[in-house]
Amino acid sequence: VSSAASDVYKRQQDYNRWGAIGYDWADPYRGDRVNSVLESKDKFNMEDMINLQIDYFSIPSKQIIELSKGHINNNIEHFEKLSRWNNVLDKNSIEAGIYIEWQTQIYFEFMKEYVPEPVQKYIEVQIYKVIEGISKMNSQQKSLFLDKTFDLAINSLEEKYGEDSSDWVYGQSNYKHVKIFHPLEKIVNDSIKDIIALKTYPRGGDGYTPGSTSNELNQRSGGSFRVVINTKDWDNSFATNSPGQSGNPKSKFYKNLYEDWGNDKFFPLLY
């Protein structure tokens, strides 16, 4: 049994209780990846289940790169990096940095070209619909759209981080990161800010990976409390939480969990 805010009913053809308030689902990719991992073998250990909660494999990246083969004419050396990439949005990955900027450009160009301007600010097209739309383009349309967006992505990366692609690493304070802000942090003096402020940590993933870190460059959503329970030996369970268990900035428990959480480290959950 798995769930990742996606439409689980599509897997149950005999489901007939449709008297719900609404039917809005997340993109299918997180759920699809979870199901793929769970179906890959019969037995899993604690480490496997921890790794699944922080899995950063990007199905959209795999689909977009496959669709683009034979259609990219400029910046070939950067596209070849993506062609050899493992599709994991690792915080230390240059390829992940290239891909996420490209995914962003693809989304905005698709909205600009295919969604009427008067309604653009009122609706949000899910990325699986964008990819579906690209897949239905003819060869010439694909080449024009994908080559244009890839050029925009590379130009944007060069403008933001410089022409040296080694500086395009995905996880960094100016790219994908997490920084939780205290509500008063921006208005208090430095002495108080030093007490209440939390650090910035580089992150991986996005809103379409099982380890969800949102589609904002500063992570805005995703799992804070996560738990893996060993029902045979309860004291061998593991969890994460963030930033701490106390709201008092002077308490040692105010942010003691934040660094490990920001680096995907679990702590023993003793019963």
Ranges and model annotations:
Residues 3-66, 74, 84-271:
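C-terminal/peripheral segments of proteins
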Residues 77:
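Active-site acid/base region of carbohydrate-active enzymes
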